[in-house]
Amino acid sequence: MIHVTVPATTANVGPGFDCLGIALSLYNHIEVEEIPEGLVIEVSGVDQDLIEKDEGNLVYQSMLKAFKAIGYQPSGLRIKQYNGIPVARGLGSSAACIVGGVLAANKMCGSPLSQDEMLEIAVEVEGHPDNVAPALLGGVVVSNRYEGKTHYVRALVHEDLKFLTAIPNVPLGTKEARDALPRVVAFEDAVFNVGKSSLLVAALFSGDLEKIKPALQDRLHQSYRAKLMSSLESVFLETEKAHLDSVFLSGAGPTVILLRWQKEGQREIKFRDIIYRMEENWEIQDLKGDNIGAQVLN
């Protein structure tokens, strides 16, 4: 039995739309083994009823992609998934399944694929690297596609960074969140995000944490996606009124994160108070960065 664990990820991180991601200390566990024939999938944990348990299962589909690249055909598979990452909440649940499947298949075959080869397979399944890259590699990752290849730069998440993560009990589909975005944006908004994302990446990579707060603002996606859920829009309005300037939408949403890096009790209390006043039930988890990424545990 091969056991792998994969971290959750937060993509975009404010202005870093479709290119910036950070691995977080929240995990999915996947166990796989080859069996004489057939396919057996068992799922437990968070949102287990939302996970397919047949050939449409994302872990299974990702394993098949890796097996094809390796040139191996298993006789049958048993897959056990334990979900710690909520589904369709903007925390990279799909990326975790994809990376876990690719890593497990590679290990089953004696690990012939390099890390970069596994990343390319994961990107092929997911369609973009912003979540799968930090899920596989850990840390803070800036990534992009150029001439059919994934290019990335990785840094460690600073040990002082904390991610106070508010997760609503209502999922938001990635397609719905993508469809909410405008096809054309104002030139000044594009320039605004280039400046903010450049400063944010420099601050995260250099460890100059005081430069993070003035770099987290966004004009390309958050305001449009916030309108998809009334309480989400209220969260952003209320946090702005409370001068909580390090709050951002995780991925496509609806999860919201307060990023902090020192003992900021009053800011945390304000954030929790705002979240708990919302209509939907929200769960708050205090997470940190994961600098290891996906790994085989046995």
From Swiss-Prot:
One of its GO terms (biological process) is threonine biosynthetic process. InterPro entries: GHMP_kinase_C_dom, GHMP_kinase_C_sf, GHMP_kinase_N_dom, GHMP_knse_ATP-bd_CS, Homoserine_kinase, Ribosomal_Su5_D2-typ_SF, Ribsml_uS5_D2-typ_fold_subgr. Pathway: Amino-acid biosynthesis; L-threonine biosynthesis; L-threonine from L-aspartate: step 4/5. It catalyses: L-homoserine + ATP = O-phospho-L-homoserine + ADP + H(+). It holds the Pfam family GHMP_kinases_N. It is found in: Cytoplasm. It comes from the Bacteria. Its main location: cytoplasm. Keywords: Amino-acid biosynthesis, ATP-binding, Cytoplasm, Kinase, Nucleotide-binding, Threonine biosynthesis, Transferase. ATP binds at residues 86-96. GO terms for molecular function: ATP binding; homoserine kinase activity. Its EC number is 2.7.1.39. Transmembrane segments: none annotated. GO terms for cellular component: cytoplasm. Catalyzes the ATP-dependent phosphorylation of L-homoserine to L-homoserine phosphate. Belongs to the GHMP kinase family. Homoserine kinase subfamily. PANTHER family: HOMOSERINE KINASE, HOMOSERINE/4-DIPHOSPHOCYTIDYL-2-C-METHYL-D-ERYTHRITOL KINASE. NCBIfam families: thrB (TIGR00191). This is Homoserine kinase. It comes from Alkaliphilus metalliredigens (strain QYMF).
